[in-house]
Design a protein with these regions (language model features):
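Short, structured surface patches at the beginning of a domain
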Residues: 1-172
Length: 173
């Protein structure tokens, strides 16, 4: 019995606790003309207040990725999101945190591919603080939930409806 205990103690010492390397993702689709949008500041404040409650060990805020004035309907038009993806691939980031799914995605297909394929492939933690709350480390199955899928479709429809309304307004001027 002693050998088992020693082996377990040796294994515990050999693998140090995981340090979460956090990337905060913040996005606003419309620029309000200021150097930094008010909503960007609000998202940052919310993330900074909530982050400590999600980690029961070491974590380090590596970087903020901010796409101000960028739509969430396409990944390839958001330079900071693309940089975040590259940093995950390079191992610089192993945890992404955002206010809610609509900040990261306004396209349900991209959302599904990212959460169901990319996140597990790179052994990365994804946290969405609100609507719906997601933590792929504590509850990996949540990405397959009906609530996450419906939220993705609702976010996509919101972007589409807003686009139609804006075009209609511009056409009447």
């Amino acid at each position: 019995m002693t050998r088992i205990r020693r082996r377990k103690e040796a294994n515990d010492q050999a693998s140090p606790p995981r340090v979460w390397k956090v990337g905060k993702y913040i996005r606003l689709s419309r620029d309000d003309g200021n150097s930094e949008s008010e909503s960007i500041g609000n998202q940052r404040k919310i993330l900074d207040q909530q982050i400590p409650g999600y980690f029961h060990g070491d974590y380090e805020i590596v970087r903020e990725y901010i796409d101000d004035g960028r739509t969430g309907t396409s990944d390839d038009t958001r330079p900071e999101f693309l940089q975040l993806v590259e940093d995950v691939k390079k191992g610089k980031i192993n945890c992404i945190i955002t206010k809610n799914l609509s900040r990261a995605f306004r396209n349900s297909a991209n959302q599904g591919k990212f959460l169901e394929e990319f996140i597990p492939l790179y052994n990365t933690r994804f946290i969405s603080l609100y609507e719906p709350c997601i933590d792929t480390f504590l509850n990996p199955e949540v990405v397959h939930s009906l609530e996450v899928s419906i939220t993705g479709f609702m976010n996509e429809q919101y972007a589409y409806k807003t686009s139609v309304d804006v075009r209609r307004t511009l056409d009447t001027k």
